[in-house]
Curated annotation (Swiss-Prot):
This is Tubulin alpha chain. InterPro entries: Tub_FtsZ_C, Tubulin, Tubulin_C. It is found in: Cytoplasm, Cytoskeleton. Belongs to the tubulin family. Dimer of alpha and beta chains. A typical microtubule is a hollow water-filled tube with an outer diameter of 25 nm and an inner diameter of 15 nM. Alpha-beta heterodimers associate head-to-tail to form protofilaments running lengthwise along the microtubule wall with the beta-tubulin subunit facing the microtubule plus end conferring a structural polarity. Microtubules usually have 13 protofilaments but different protofilament numbers can be found in some organisms and specialized cells. GO terms for cellular component: cytoplasm; microtubule. One of its GO terms (biological process) is microtubule-based process.
């Protein structure tokens, strides 16, 4: 499929850059999900200690 986009004027480097950007975005979402799950776990455990 890349050759179609290159034929329309895109550069191949743009695909690599987009792939890296998506990988970074996915990693950010995973980190936020982990932090959110940890924060929810702390909130649930807070009331049990009293």
């Amino acid at each position: 499929f890349v050759h179609w986009y290159v034929g329309e004027g895109m550069e191949e480097g743009e695909f690599s850059e987009a792939r890296e950007d998506l990988a970074a975005l996915e990693k950010d979402y995973e980190e936020v999900g982990i932090e959110t799950a940890e924060a929810e776990g702390e909130e649930e455990g807070y009331g049990e200690e009293l």
